Amino acid sequence: MGRSYEKSKQAFEEAQHLMPGGVNSPVRAFKSVNTDPIFMERGKGAKIYDIDGNEYIDYVLSWGPLILGHTNDRVVESIQRVAEKGTSFGASTLVENELAKLVSERVPSIEVIRMVSSGTEATMSALRLARGFTGRNKIVKFEGCYHGHGDSLLIKAGSGVATLGLPDSPGVPEGTASNTITVPYNDLESIQVAFQEFGDDIAGVIVEPVAGNMGVVPPQDGFLQGLRDITEQYGALLIFDEVMTGFRVDYHCAQGYFGVTPDLTCLGKVIGGGLPVGAYGGRADIMRQIAPSGPIYQAGTLSGNPLAMTAGLETLKQLTPESYEEFRRKGDRLEEGISNAAKTHGIPLTFNRAGSMIGFFFTDEEVINYDIAKNADLALFAEFYKEMADHGIFLPPSQFEGLFLSTAHTDEDIEYTIETVEKVFQKLRR
């Protein structure tokens, strides 16, 4: 397509001397697709522009937060209005109350909420709360589910069905890892094995109700309800990590869509409107154990800062039940178009969706867990990624990340994307 990435290349060369790997978050290094990262300059609506002047239809959307698209006029105006009065006070502001009330109205399981500054803070704090509330030590998580970079969550499974964790990153103490039990996603039998062996010491089960960091992998029928049933049976807490799915999958989050009520919920991304944010909330009797109303400590200098609260509030105000019907309609069209193109050109492809979260894998096998996701054709994805970028479509630079839709994506954007996929599949056909 004759695109130049020379300025991005030069910027990355400089960045590698300044930051570990040249980036402030590993996925931005584009290692999974074997190419240099693209440096972005600005965005508007569903479009972004790199420092070389190339335009893209954006399906990354800052990894999910920008559900209204880039620089939404009302969100930007609200941030500017608040910034003129003060960016942070280290004291409470009215907008914290407003956002908390709106979240609780749309997600009834969140009776009380605590704002923090990142999804990682939210999940770490929720685990501490679960342990403090139950007086137990162990946490169950699922293989391939990412819950931030807290020590007790950077854990992988061993060779057994239900195993005590081993550190997945240097620097995580084995003692910390030993209190994390990892089991396969969408596998209720393995959960039962874990509880039969460790149930008296399991404080909680943390799960992405739709997995979003092994690609997009929805829960199978009965999986989430099965988790609800077994946690209630053993007196453990069910924690939904809705940092990604919250207000993306549905107007009432994934828990509303699937009709399963957790004890605690972690939020982030969308509720900050593109600014750093996180939150955790749930049953009042559990949440009131957090300081200063209870003994379980958690604090943050910028928690509930007025800029993020305002951006999140304005974002949620613009989302209606009809917004999610539009997401479904556009998602249906993308799935139809991309799946048909794959069939036409003999490309093995499995398409997964949940609300405005989209994932596809270069494999004929149904993807229901991390082991299957890992068997997708990663080399083909890398080729596909580079070709799509050259045609002006910005996708996540990893097979194991989802695509996102925004209210700013037009039918024309969707049709151009499908036409581009058709051209790229024809070129990649083998």
UniProtKB/Swiss-Prot annotation:
<dbReference type="GO" id="GO:0005737">
    <property type="term" value="C:cytoplasm"/>
</dbReference>
<dbReference type="InterPro" id="IPR015421">
    <property type="entry name" value="PyrdxlP-dep_Trfase_major"/>
</dbReference>
<dbReference type="InterPro" id="IPR004639">
    <property type="entry name" value="4pyrrol_synth_GluAld_NH2Trfase"/>
</dbReference>
<dbReference type="GO" id="GO:0030170">
    <property type="term" value="F:pyridoxal phosphate binding"/>
</dbReference>
<dbReference type="GO" id="GO:0006782">
    <property type="term" value="P:protoporphyrinogen IX biosynthetic process"/>
</dbReference>
<keyword id="KW-0663">Pyridoxal phosphate</keyword>
<dbReference type="Pfam" id="PF00202">
    <property type="entry name" value="Aminotran_3"/>
</dbReference>
<dbReference type="InterPro" id="IPR049704">
    <property type="entry name" value="Aminotrans_3_PPA_site"/>
</dbReference>
<dbReference type="InterPro" id="IPR005814">
    <property type="entry name" value="Aminotrans_3"/>
</dbReference>
<keyword id="KW-0413">Isomerase</keyword>
<protein>
    <recommendedName>
        <fullName>Glutamate-1-semialdehyde 2,1-aminomutase 2</fullName>
        <ecNumber>5.4.3.8</ecNumber>
    </recommendedName>
</protein>
<keyword id="KW-0963">Cytoplasm</keyword>
<dbReference type="GO" id="GO:0042286">
    <property type="term" value="F:glutamate-1-semialdehyde 2,1-aminomutase activity"/>
</dbReference>
<dbReference type="InterPro" id="IPR015422">
    <property type="entry name" value="PyrdxlP-dep_Trfase_small"/>
</dbReference>
<comment type="similarity">
    <text>Belongs to the class-III pyridoxal-phosphate-dependent aminotransferase family. HemL subfamily.</text>
</comment>
<keyword id="KW-0627">Porphyrin biosynthesis</keyword>
<feature type="modified residue" description="N6-(pyridoxal phosphate)lysine">
    <location>
        <position position="269"/>
    </location>
</feature>
<comment type="pathway">
    <text>Porphyrin-containing compound metabolism; protoporphyrin-IX biosynthesis; 5-aminolevulinate from L-glutamyl-tRNA(Glu): step 2/2.</text>
</comment>
<comment type="subunit">
    <text>Homodimer.</text>
</comment>
<dbReference type="InterPro" id="IPR015424">
    <property type="entry name" value="PyrdxlP-dep_Trfase"/>
</dbReference>
<dbReference type="GO" id="GO:0008483">
    <property type="term" value="F:transaminase activity"/>
</dbReference>
